[in-house]
Each structure stands twice: as structure tokens, then as C-alpha cells.
UniProtKB/Swiss-Prot annotation:
This is N-terminal acetyltransferase A complex catalytic subunit ard1. Component of the N-terminal acetyltransferase A (NatA) complex, which is composed of at least ard1 and nat1. Gene3D superfamilies: 3.40.630.30. It catalyses: N-terminal glycyl-[protein] + acetyl-CoA = N-terminal N(alpha)-acetylglycyl-[protein] + CoA + H(+); N-terminal L-alanyl-[protein] + acetyl-CoA = N-terminal N(alpha)-acetyl-L-alanyl-[protein] + CoA + H(+); N-terminal L-seryl-[protein] + acetyl-CoA = N-terminal N(alpha)-acetyl-L-seryl-[protein] + CoA + H(+); N-terminal L-valyl-[protein] + acetyl-CoA = N-terminal N(alpha)-acetyl-L-valyl-[protein] + CoA + H(+). Its main location: cytoplasm. It comes from Schizosaccharomyces pombe (strain 972 / ATCC 24843). The gene is ard1. One of its GO terms (cellular component) is nucleus. Keywords: Acyltransferase, Cytoplasm, Nucleus, Transferase. GO terms for molecular function: protein N-terminal-serine acetyltransferase activity; protein-N-terminal-alanine acetyltransferase activity; protein-N-terminal-glutamate acetyltransferase activity. Residues 1-153 form the N-acetyltransferase domain. Catalytic component of the NatA N-terminal acetyltransferase, which catalyzes acetylation of proteins beginning with Met-Ser, Met-Gly and Met-Ala. N-acetylation plays a role in normal eukaryotic translation and processing, protect against proteolytic degradation and protein turnover. Its EC number is 2.3.1.255.
């Protein structure tokens, strides 16, 4: 397994991952806009054959209302057969690191469906995001969203597990299936 910055050639794979997993879908030009505008913020997880199995699509807020430079997670998704391997966490951490190191971001924001317990657990319990409020009827189907925020002032990056360790885990899962 490899985690790396997204390339233009990855965009259709990212879109495919999104279409398989999430109700919020985007046109290819939206992925392209992110890739061109903030090339160091979006990352992909690829399998040994180079196929995109997960991604994080991220951006910097262009005109922040509070005047503070900060990033925003537009979308994150991992294909079902590759979940519970820590890929979403690794993708998010890579994007956070780039927001801080490349753009000087002070915090990151995102929205999550109130019904998405797995994502809320990842953001709140694993990645230490705080719920800032509820945005009523945020999604097209009328569901509310939690507006979440992660302050980078005390950010410390864990050393991610090596690609070799993750590859061994994936290989063992493949052998057991």
C-alpha cells in the first residue's frame, strides 16, 4: 500500500472511490480544481497494482471569514475492502501535515453527516476534532451535518506505520479472503 500526493491521473480513481462509497458525489472538474489549486493537499492510497483504494480531497479556504489560514476536508473515502487498515487516518494526517508545512494552516475544518458514526469516531476520537456546531439540512437530502474543527496549535505528527507493515497486513487479508 502506498500513500502519496494525488496526481491528475488519479482523479478518475478518486471519483470512482467516491461514487462507490458516498452519497455526495462531485463532477471530475471539481477534483481537477482541487488538484490544480492545492496540489499538495489531496492524497491517495493505492493498492499494489496502483489502483486508488482511498483518498482525501482537501483545500485551503480561499477567503476565510475569520482571516485565519485554514484547510478544509472536502471528502475522504476508502473502499470497503480496504477499511480498518488505518488508511483514512493516514490520508488525513498527510493532508494535515501539508496544510501546516506548505500553507501555514492554523486549523482544519470538515462537515460530517450526523448519522455517519464511523466517520465521527475517526474524526473526534482518533484525530481529535471538536464539534463546533450543527448545520441544519447541510446535505442535499436534508440531513444535518456536524461542523468539526481541529486546532493545529498543539499538533504533533505520529510516525505513520511503514508502507511495509501496511503491505504485510493487506497481503495477509488477501490470503484470508
Amino acid at each position: 500500500m502506498d500513500i502519496r500526493p494525488a496526481r491528475i491521473s488519479d482523479l478518475t480513481g478518486m471519483q470512482n472511490c467516491n461514487l462507490h462509497n458516498l452519497p455526495e458525489n462531485y463532477q471530475l472538474k471539481y477534483y481537477l480544481y482541487h488538484a490544480i489549486s492545492w496540489p499538495m493537499l489531496s492524497y491517495v492510497a493505492t493498492d499494489p497494482k496502483g489502483r486508488v483504494v482511498g483518498y482525501v480531497l482537501a483545500k485551503m479556504e480561499e477567503e476565510p471569514k475569520d482571516g485565519i489560514p485554514h484547510g478544509h476536508i472536502t471528502s475522504v473515502s476508502v473502499m470497503r475492502s480496504y477499511r480498518h487498515l488505518g488508511l483514512a487516518k493516514r490520508l488525513m494526517v498527510q493532508s494535515q501535515r501539508a496544510m501546516v508545512e506548505v500553507y501555514g494552516a492554523k486549523y482544519m475544518s470538515l462537515h460530517v453527516r450526523k448519522s455517519n458514526r464511523a466517520a465521527i469516531h475517526l474524526y473526534r476520537d482518533t484525530l481529535q476534532f471538536d464539534v463546533q456546531g450543527i448545520e441544519s439540512k447541510y446535505y442535499a437530502d436534508g440531513e444535518d451535518a456536524y461542523a468539526m474543527h481541529k486546532d493545529f496549535s498543539t499538533l504533533k505528527f505520529d510516525t505513520p506505520e511503514t508502507n511495509d507493515e501496511l503491505a504485510k497486513t493487506v497481503q495477509s487479508l488477501a490470503l484470508n479472503n
